[in-house]
Amino acid sequence: VHSFPANTIYRLYLDPANNMWAGSIRRGLIGIKNVYACSYQNVPFGNLYGLSNQTINSFFQDSDGIVWVGTDGGGINRFDPVSGTFKHYPATKYEKVVSIVEYTPDELLFFSFNKGLFIFHKKTGQIRPFVLIDKEMNDQTCINGFSVNIQRITKTKILFSAQHIFIYDMVTRKFDIVATMGEEYERHSPLIIATKGAKTYLSDLKNICEYDSSEGTFRTIYQG
């Protein structure tokens, strides 16, 4: 009898090929198909056949099918499902990558816990800081012991979930604050459930909220 290789799952991701990816705590990355499941665990840094850290915080799959894995202290890992191999990046080696999204076709935007937001170049593996509004707001938001959750909600807009809900317009390079903790929602850094069309759903572990990008409105749709 074969049992599931992990007890605690932190993230789930269903890719376009209907494969389920489970990011576990201390048991690595688990790929699940209708017929089998395979797991990948940590290996020495730079090894092609495993993760740089066995706790997974986040995923993103790009248009080429590459899965970008955010680990808890081992930075960003690139996983090629076709070859079954990984690539680790020295510039992100010790980062705790809480959330990760596409920024441009060649770049990713990620949040490193208690360190800040960074843009990662997929080809060079180098990173550079991304400032949330200005230095004061960036430090208040990103270096305070809380997570910042990120979601690409349209082709040109990114949502940041923290003590405020920020919307970044990639064309104008301007931010809007559309909600604030203690007013529109109760707890810090609501988890982003999903984006469906113009609507993005979030949970602060008590209530469920909705941001409508077509109207620019934020509201609570379920009170727990």
Regions flagged by a language model, labelled:
Residues 1-224:
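Carboxylate-rich, polar loop motifs that coordinate divalent cations or form catalytic acidic clusters
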